[in-house]
């Protein structure tokens, strides 16, 4: 299995507002960057979408070290999702899980890979995280045209 490092970040101007995601993918000496902007979304949706798009771009099963600055994403995918699924995508308070479309997509995107999820403090000088932040912010600021279909504002 190939070993890949993924770094992801999301940005939202206004929250909700225009948003974007950024991802940096490293395999051996190769580096690939992904980013995309959306008209109206939230920071959490962009954090999730960064992970989804990065994982979906892998063409074969890989061993992935995925680093995010979002505790929401890391805890959601490693801890909370198991009970959400058992409860039919409801929280402990029996409320519908927010961003369920993206949680399902993220769960499916990680399925064929062996993913180790890591958290890094945002804006702390971590080079790849800073680059992802820059990509995400620029995507949000650069007149985004994409519609976030699942966003329920």
UniProtKB/Swiss-Prot annotation:
- Compartments reported by the entry: Cytoplasm
- What's its EC? 3.1.26.4
Indicate the segments forming the RNase H type-1 domain, all copies.
1-141
- Record: residues binding Mg(2+) 1: 9, 47, 69
Q: Which reaction does it catalyse?
A: Endonucleolytic cleavage to 5'-phosphomonoester
Cofactor binding mode and count = Binds 1 Mg(2+) ion per subunit. May bind a second metal ion at a regulatory site, or after substrate binding.
Question: Does this entry carry the keyword Cell membrane?
Answer: no
Example GO molecular function: nucleic acid binding
Function according to Swiss-Prot or TrEMBL: Endonuclease that specifically degrades the RNA of RNA-DNA hybrids.
What is the official name of this protein in its record? Answer: Ribonuclease H
- Encoding gene per record: rnhA
